[in-house]
Amino acid sequence: DIHPHGFARESVFDLKSIGENTVTFVLTENEKTLSQYPFRFRLEVTYTLEKNTLSTTYAVTNTDDKEIFYNIGAHDTYAISTDYENYEIEYEKPENILDNGLFEKNEPAVEEPTEQMKRICIKSNIVPGKTVYFFSKNLNSSWVQLLYKGNPIVRVYFDKNNTGSLVWHISYI
């Protein structure tokens, strides 16, 4: 059985290459991965830094003799200031954020959701260890970013120890 968060996060990646503004790591099947995921593969993760933007690229190669199935659901983490009210989420295009976009079970994620929102200010009363959910009717954007005073950072989960770790999880199925 595969762990709910997958096997790659618990695996040791090899360094493939280092460039002026990129680094690539590679993971291939091994005895441990094959016990959870019965396919031969090559997963390359490349991080590219351009100006103030960090991009992550995933490349999966089927090295097996049969069709493989996979999903990338990354949980990148970055250290940030704990002054959460200084942050906002910006969508590429205006989105229809539902009233039931949640901060916690019954608490709205935004102060006053509007029909079309491009930027959402993060509430100052974030509870460490809680995940913030923003539900959209039909997502129009191909990207979402978190801004801090004009500098893009990325990703939204606030760690329970309130150390300023921030995680954003997007999974495409």
Task: Enumerate the language-model features and the residues they cover.
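Active-site/ligand-binding surface loops and adjacent short beta/alpha elements
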Residues: 77-161
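Beta-strand elements of well-folded, non-transmembrane domains
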Residues: 29-31, 49-51, 62-64, 76-80, ...
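Structural motif
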Residues: 22, 53-55, 67, 143, ...
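Extended, loop-rich substrate-binding clefts of extracytoplasmic carbohydrate-active enzymes
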Residues: 2-51
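Hydrophobic residues positioned within well-ordered beta-strands of beta-sheet architectures
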Residues: 23-25, 43-45, 56, 72-74, ...
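Residues that act as N-cap/strand-start positions at coil-to-secondary-structure junctions
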Residues: 7-10, 39-41, 72, 83, ...
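Acidic (Asp/Glu-rich), glycine- and aromatic
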Residues: 41, 57-88
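A C-terminal functional module that forms or caps the active site or interfaces directly
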Residues: 157-173
